[in-house]
Design a protein with these regions (language model features):
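Ser/Thr/Asn(+Pro)-rich, low-complexity disordered segments
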Residues: 7, 11, 106-411
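Extracellular polysaccharide-recognition and catalytic grooves
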Residues: 1-158
């Protein structure tokens, strides 16, 4: 037993150091993240290894700072993998860490903390700076760009002694998540260099879309109309509030766009649009949705594309950045959108020219190749970490904290 404990401690120290240098989590879905968090909390509370305990504490600090930066009213935004259409977190949840975060930082008095309530018994507490970031209402608009592990192979290894698949993973492999956070919404997508394969747990059921201020269940996201598990079923590009998607899988599944809250018509059929755009308001935010080909349809309480292979645009806004709802609509309707069957091109005065070739998956932004690579593990106004450095610099309202996983110190 002592030898097993020693080897386990060495493994977890190596695991945390590796994650600190090459990216935190592969998936991001709340149910999978919760399992990892519970394990880390247990290590923190019960290990007698001082160095390991400190590393776990530092790692959890970064996790909660990341949560504070990515969240709107405690609800984590950004792209995630392994979020199933059939699961409640796809449409009305993503709330496991949100409920615990709301309790930690007093974000929502009405929020129930059920799934992770046992973690309150832990002696671990998030750093004060995470609470300050989470509760601040004047953070403005900002980008959060992260590099996470996800490259690997599609090979699944079967171990002889346990009945569980093991997914191969290159720990240094890049999958990039991009999130645009404003005071009223947080929108995110995920992309990767397609020249090398990604592991199945990174490609499976990716969730891309936005969460909104005003309702913990408010969402807009793209999906395929099936409960089956799908892999890399969409490709995307994003800059700021503009997201463009294309279906990346064959099959009869309809392409859908989930919007909540949304008022459906009494009868199914073609959805009324303005110049091809579906406009709406979600509390303090605006949205515009347009398919490059075909129409938007209402069918059995769903918004579907009549041409399921068509690329489509989701453009978000709010009163702060775009004026009135009518101002927002006027601007969007003046933006050129063309599609020749191969490439969709969308122009916005502020965010630039988006080009997406659905045949080759080549993407260009303002005439330059759209990059699915990042130099840093995390990059945003409040936290930065250079890849392979093992150092995170956190800054907020004049306060600076340096997490150094090489020296096991916080300064």
């Amino acid at each position: 037993l002592p030898e097993f404990v020693s080897h386990s401690e060495e493994f977890f120290i190596k695991y945390i150091d590796e994650r600190a240098k090459t990216g935190l989590f592969v998936e991001g879905a709340e149910n999978y993240r919760a399992v990892t968090l519970e394990s880390l909390y247990n290590i923190y509370d019960f290990t007698e290894n001082v160095a390991l305990k400190k590393k776990v504490e530092m790692f959890l600090d970064i996790v909660w700072i990341e949560y504070a930066i990515e969240s709107i009213e405690g609800i984590r935004g950004g792209a995630k993998a392994r979020v199933y259409n059939r699961a409640t977190d796809a449409a009305s949840g993503l709330l496991w860490t949100a409920s615990l975060g709301s309790l930690y930082f007093n974000l929502n008095e009405d929020e129930k903390c059920e799934t992770l309530i046992t973690l309150i018994a832990s002696s671990y507490r998030p750093p004060e700076i995470a609470g300050k970031i989470a509760k601040a209402e004047n953070k403005g608009n900002y980008e959060v760009i992260k590099s996470i592990p996800g490259k690997g192979t599609t090979e699944v290894i079967k171990l002889t002694n346990i009945d569980m698949p093991v997914y191969t993973l290159n720990p240094a492999g890049d999958v990039i998540t991009y999130e645009y956070v404003t005071p009223t919404y947080a929108a995110g997508t995920m992309c990767h260099d397609e020249s090398t394969p990604i592991t199945l747990i990174s490609s499976q059921n990716r969730w891309e879309g936005a969460v909104f201020k005003g309702d913990k269940n408010a969402r807009i996201y793209r999906y395929l109309d099936t409960d089956k598990s799908l892999h890399a079923h969409f490709l995307s590009m994003q800059k700021g509030p503009v997201m463009i998607f294309k279906k990346n899988t064959s099959g009869a599944f309809d392409t859908g766009i989930y919007i909540y809250p949304y008022s459906f018509a009494e009868a199914d059929g073609e959805i009324k649009t303005e110049g091809g755009w579906l406009f709406g308001e979600i509390y303090d935010s605006y949205y515009a949705v347009r398919a490059a080909s075909g129409k938007l349809l209402q069918k059995e309480g769903k918004i579907l594309l009549s041409d399921s292979e068509s690329p489509f645009v989701i453009h978000l806004g709010n009163k702060i950045d775009d004026g009135s709802f009518e101002d927002f609509k006027k601007n969007i309707k003046s933006n050129p959108l063309t599609f020749d069957g191969n490439s969709v091109c969308y122009n916005d005065k502020r965010w630039g020219r988006f080009e997406f070739n659905i045949k080759t998956a080549e993407r260009r932004l303002n005439g330059k190749a759209f990059s699915c690579k990042a130099e840093n593990i995390m990059e945003c106004p409040f936290i930065n970490s250079v890849k392979n450095s093992g150092i995170f610099e956190v800054t907020f309202e004049g306060e600076k904290i340096i997490y150094d996983f090489n020296e096991n110190t916080v300064k």
